[in-house]
Swiss-Prot record:
Gene name tied to this protein: fam210a
Organism from which the protein derives: Xenopus tropicalis
InterPro entries tied to this protein: FAM210A/B-like, FAM210A/B-like_dom
Protein name according to UniProt: Protein FAM210A
Disulphide bond pairs: none
GO cellular component: cytoplasm; membrane; mitochondrion
Role noted for this protein: May play a role in the structure and strength of both muscle and bone.
Keyword match Cytoplasm: yes
Top-rank lineage group of the source organism: Eukaryota
Family: Belongs to the FAM210 family.
């Protein structure tokens, strides 16, 4: 039995060696994954001695950028925490815009600046506008008297034929021509009015005829101080009222206690006498 076992083992080993030789001749280099967790690979080389070569796992390329949604939450919080500075800068920018005078603000249109100046400096703008408008209309009327014809200019601009025909066939004469020129020069008139208003306001403020408006920041600060004072006064009043009520209730309770003490003492005396 022992001899049979040894023969069988030798035959099996010879078959295995033949199979391995054939496999090495068919493919000289083969790779088998050994561990899935580590990602290593084993390479078998057909040499006289069997050599097992471990290849390192592929490292991730550092040049590849991680998308924004794969970033950790801490980096996102840091990016969000940088937003208050932007908010504060926006708030300061808005306060600066609010503090600018419409006469000096060149970021808005001419008509809007004219309306804002009318709301803020209406008492100065109206006389200046009347004076400049009378000057404009007078100069245009004088030009119409001297024979200035506006119709070719209106046709060149491209105004509707209805307006051009009214000026051609009108009996108004110089007045209508002057009015047409007056309306055409509206942007120039508004610009001159704003310039005159600015100079007038500076002159009146310089000599004390017009008070300089406070800044928006100072105005809000004054209002906050006023509301704070009113709030403290109301709190003191309510505190005094509550303290007075507490004193009244304390006096009443002390009176009731004294009455009950007197009654108890009187009853004790009665019981002792009896």
């Amino acid at each position: 039995m022992h001899l049979l076992r040894t023969l069988l083992l030798r035959s099996n080993t010879s078959n295995i060696s033949l199979l391995t030789k054939c496999a090495f001749r068919a493919c000289p280099l083969q790779k088998w994954p050994v561990s899935l967790r580590s990602g290593c690979q084993v390479s078998v080389l057909p040499t006289q001695q069997k050599k097992w070569l471990h290849s390192q796992p592929k490292q991730q390329d550092s040049s590849t950028k991680t998308p924004v949604h794969d970033l950790p939450s801490g980096s996102q919080h840091q990016s969000e925490e940088s937003s208050p500075s932007a908010k504060s800068s926006i708030s300061t920018d808005t306060s600066i815009v609010a503090e600018t005078d419409p006469l000096q603000d060149q970021s808005i249109g001419l008509l809007k600046r004219f309306k804002k100046t009318f709301k803020q400096h209406g008492k100065v703008l109206i006389p200046v506008h009347l004076v400049t408008s009378s000057f404009w209309f007078g100069s245009f009327y004088y030009a119409a008297m001297k024979g200035v014809n506006v119709v070719p200019f209106l046709e060149f601009i491209g105004l509707p034929d209805v307006i051009v025909n009214i000026l051609k066939n009108s009996q108004g004469g110089n007045a209508l021509t002057a009015y047409a020129m007056y309306k055409i020069a509206t942007p120039a008139r508004y610009t001159v009015t704003l310039g005159g208003t600015s100079l007038s306001v500076k002159y009146l403020r310089k000599y004390g005829y017009l008070s300089t408006p406070p800044l928006v920041k100072d105005y809000f600060q004054d209002r906050m101080e006023e509301t704070k004072e009113l709030f403290t006064e109301k709190m003191e009043e309510t505190r005094d009222i509550i303290s007075g009520k507490m004193e009244e209730t304390k006096d009443r309770i002390s009176e009731k206690l004294q009455e009950t003490k007197d009654r108890v003492a009187f009853r004790k005396k009665k019981n002792e006498e009896m």
